[in-house]
Amino acid sequence: MSDGEEGTPMKHPKPASSVEEAPITTTPFPDLLSSMQAYYGGAAPAAFYASTVGSPSPHPYMWRNQHRFILPYGIPMQYPALFLPGGIFTHPIVPTDPNLAPTSGEVGRKISDEKGRTSAKKSIGVSGSTSFAVDKGAENQKAASSSDNDCPSLSSENGVDGSLEVRSNPLDVAAPGAIVVHDGMLPDQRVNDERELKRQRRKQSNRESARRSRLRKQAKSDELQERLDNLSKENRILRKNLQRISEACAEVTSENHSIKEELLRNYGPDGLTRLPRNLQEAAGELLIEDDTDGET
């Protein structure tokens, strides 16, 4: 026994400390504490009791502007402190004009990120898992209100870690400055294509007008060529007639010379001077004879 007792070391009791160590306490919501100090001006804020059920709403001291209407059960309230400045946010019952909220897509994404961070911090601070059941009527009403008013919808499911799933439905409105694409083409390409199409149409119309002008000129040239051929034929015919008349005139002239020579030989030069009178008398006698023959 003595050997066994000598082999085992003796355990000395720990001395009781006169001053107990203070437990280290950490603030679960450092961002809320800073906002409360900024809101109350450094005064002692009121006590805050954590709820056993996770809520999508932020800290109650951040409710600066209360809503005038009471929302149905299950619809999260929208607070101006969580939204970006310059945006337009109305009651879920009142529809929002998409023309007055150009940056709704960015606002929806930022709201979902901010609510996700807030819900994560609350889920860490609350002990245990948080879960709440929403009846089917309230869930349908919440879905209808979120789809009608384009507000971020909050859906919760009973999970192991008790985290909340935040889902946002941003407005289907194009952000300002976005380039609208028509038929897979940018506006500049569309304008260039329209200009090129107009240029091609102008060239085509010019080609058509030039072709019609060539056809008109060709038809006129063919007509003139036909007239030229006709005139050439007529000219050849007239020349032939003139040549024949010239030949006949030459024959008459030669006969006249021969008759004149014969008269000179028969009557002499004096006979030629009396010849026209004699011819007239002879012609008159012939006419008288013809008249008498006709009467008989």
Swiss-Prot record:
The entry lists its GO molecular-function terms as: DNA-binding transcription factor activity; transcription cis-regulatory region binding
Task: Name the keywords, alphabetized.
Answer: DNA-binding, Nucleus, Transcription, Transcription regulation
Signal sequence coordinates: none
User: Would you tell me the Gene Ontology cellular component terms?
Assistant: nucleus
Q: Where in the cell is it found?
A: Nucleus
Q: Outline the segment boundaries, as ranges, of region: Basic motif.
A: 198-220
Q: Which InterPro entries match?
A: bZIP, bZIP_plant_GBF1, bZIP_sf, GBF-like, MFMR
| Domain bZIP positions | 196-259
| PANTHER family named among the record's database cross-references | G-BOX-BINDING FACTOR 1, G-BOX-BINDING FACTOR 3-RELATED
Q: What is its main location?
A: nucleus
Biased-composition ranges, Basic and acidic residues, are 107-117
What is the species listed in this Swiss-Prot or TrEMBL entry?
Petroselinum crispum
What Gene3D superfamilies does the annotation carry? 1.20.5.170
**Which SMART domains does the record cross-reference, listed alphabetically?**
BRLZ
Q: How does it assemble?
A: Binds DNA as a dimer.
The protein's name is Light-inducible protein CPRF3
Region Disordered: start-end pairs: 1-27, 98-165, 190-223
Q: Which cysteines are joined by disulfide bonds?
A: none
The superkingdom of the source organism is Eukaryota
Task: State the residue spans of region: Leucine-zipper.
Answer: 224-245
Low complexity: compositionally biased ranges? 145-156
